[in-house]
Curated annotation (Swiss-Prot):
Superkingdom of origin organism: Bacteria
Note accompanying the cofactor annotation: Binds 1 [4Fe-4S] cluster per subunit.
Protein name: 4-hydroxy-3-methylbut-2-enyl diphosphate reductase
Record organism: Aeromonas hydrophila subsp. hydrophila (strain ATCC 7966 / DSM 30187 / BCRC 13018 / CCUG 14551 / JCM 1027 / KCTC 2358 / NCIMB 9240 / NCTC 8049)
Residues annotated for (2E)-4-hydroxy-3-methylbut-2-enyl diphosphate binding in this entry: 41, 74, 124, 167, 225-227, 269
Record: residues binding dimethylallyl diphosphate: 41, 74, 124, 225-227, 269
Keywords: 4Fe-4S, Iron, Iron-sulfur, Isoprene biosynthesis, Metal-binding, Oxidoreductase
GO molecular function, one term: metal ion binding
Pfam families: LYTB
Job description of the protein: Catalyzes the conversion of 1-hydroxy-2-methyl-2-(E)-butenyl 4-diphosphate (HMBPP) into a mixture of isopentenyl diphosphate (IPP) and dimethylallyl diphosphate (DMAPP). Acts in the terminal step of the DOXP/MEP pathway for isoprenoid precursor biosynthesis.
InterPro entries: LytB/IspH
Annotated catalytic residues: 126
Family statement drawn from the similarity comment of this UniProt entry: Belongs to the IspH family.
C-alpha cells in the first residue's frame, strides 16, 4: 500500500498566528491565560495549550476581573468586544486577518445601511462573529447556506444588497450559492476578492487533484473543524472513500482492505505531528512507499501583536 501526502496540508498562517499568540501570552504573563472559545478547532492543539496553562471558556462572564483574555481565530461579535472593554479586560485578538477582512466588509455595509447576506454554517463561531458585525437596525443581515435558502430569502431592498462568505467553506458549494444569489438578486454586490481563504482553497485543490490517484483518503482534523469536514466531503465527492480522524488511534484496519494507495491530508488547524503519527500507523498496517504529492507552495505569514513578540 502506497501512502500519498497532500500538499499543502495542515496549519495555515492564521492558525499559526493564533497558537503563537496564546503561547507568547503564556510565556510573557504566565498562567492562567483565558481564551474565549477553542483558539482553533483541534483537540490536540487545545489540550497542549491547556497543559501549558490556557483556560478555555465560552463566554466572558467566565473570565475573572483583571485577567488576560484571547479571542479565538474565528473572531467575535462587536458585542463581545464591547463587553471586554467595559470590564477593562486585557485583550489579545487572535482573529485570523482574513476573517477580519470579512468583518470589515460587513461593518461597511452596516454603516452605509446596505443589507448583507452571509453564506455560512449556522452556529459556527466564525458565522456568529461575522453576523455580530452588523448593527444597523434600518438594514438587515441574513444567513444562507444553500441555493434553497436563497430561493426563500426576502430582503427589504434588493437594489442595495451585498454578500460575504465564511472563510472555510467548500469552494464548489459556495460557488453554487453565489450563482443563486446573483440570479435571485441581480444587483447584489460581492467582495472584490472571494472571501474563502487561500489555505481553504489550496487544501481543497490538493485533495481534488489527489483523489483520483488513491483508493481512500484520511483527513486529519477534529469533527468541529469546518475546513476539515469540507476536505472529507470533497474527497468523497470526487470518488475516494474518505475518513475524518483526530489522530492515528482512530484508523481502523478494515478501512484499508483492498486499498493499494491511500492519501493523507490535514485540515488547517491540524499539526504536522498528527500527520506523522498517522504515517507511522499506516506503515504498521502495511504501508510502504511514502510520497509527497506536489502542490501549491504557501509563504503567507501573519505577525503576532507587537506586545507579544518574543525577542
Amino acid at each position: 500500500m502506497n501512502i500519498l501526502l497532500a500538499n499543502p496540508r495542515g496549519f495555515c498562517a492564521g492558525v499559526d498566528r493564533a497558537i503563537s499568540i496564546v503561547e507568547s501570552a503564556l510565556e510573557k504573563f504566565g498562567a492562567p491565560i483565558y481564551v474565549r472559545h477553542e483558539v482553533v478547532h483541534n483537540r490536540y492543539v487545545v489540550n497542549k495549550l491547556k497543559e501549558a496553562g490556557a483556560v478555555f471558556v465560552e463566554e466572558l462572564d467566565e473570565v475573572p476581573d483583571d485577567s488576560i483574555v484571547i479571542f479565538s481565530a474565528h473572531g467575535v461579535s462587536k458585542a463581545v468586544r464591547e463587553m471586554a472593554k467595559s470590564r477593562a479586560l486585557k485583550v489579545f485578538d487572535a482573529t485570523c486577518p482574513l476573517v477580519t477582512k470579512v468583518h470589515m466588509e460587513v461593518h461597511r455595509a452596516s454603516r452605509k445601511g446596505s443589507e448583507a447576506v452571509l453564506i455560512g454554517h449556522a452556529g459556527h463561531p466564525e458565522v456568529i462573529g461575522t453576523m455580530g458585525q452588523y448593527e444597523n437596525r434600518e438594514g438587515g443581515m441574513y444567513l444562507v447556506e444553500t441555493p434553497e435558502d436563497v430561493a426563500k430569502l426576502k430582503v427589504k431592498n434588493p437594489d442595495d444588497l451585498c454578500f460575504v462568505t465564511q472563510t472555510t467553506l467548500s469552494v464548489d458549494e459556495t460557488s453554487d450559492v453565489i450563482d443563486a444569489l446573483r440570479a435571485h438578486f441581480p444587483k447584489i454586490q460581492g467582495p472584490r476578492k472571494d472571501d474563502i481563504c487561500y489555505a481553504t482553497q489550496n487544501r481543497q485543490d490538493a485533495v481534488r487533484e489527489m483523489a483520483g490517484l488513491v483508493d481512500a483518503m484520511l483527513v486529519v482534523g477534529s469533527r468541529n473543524s469546518s475546513n476539515s469536514n469540507r476536505l472529507r466531503e470533497l474527497a468523497e465527492k470526487v470518488g475516494a472513500k474518505a475518513y475524518l480522524i483526530d489522530d492515528a488511534s482512530m484508523i481502523e484496519a478494515d478501512w484499508l482492505a483492498g486499498v493499494e494507495a491511500i492519501g493523507v491530508t490535514a485540515g488547517a488547524s491540524a499539526p504536522e505531528v498528527l500527520v506523522q503519527s498517522v504515517i507511522t500507523r499506516l506503515r504498521e498496517l502495511g504501508g510502504k512507499v511514502v510520497a509527497e504529492h506536489p502542490g501549491r507552495e504557501e509563504n503567507v505569514v501573519f505577525e503576532v501583536p507587537p506586545e507579544l513578540r518574543i525577542l
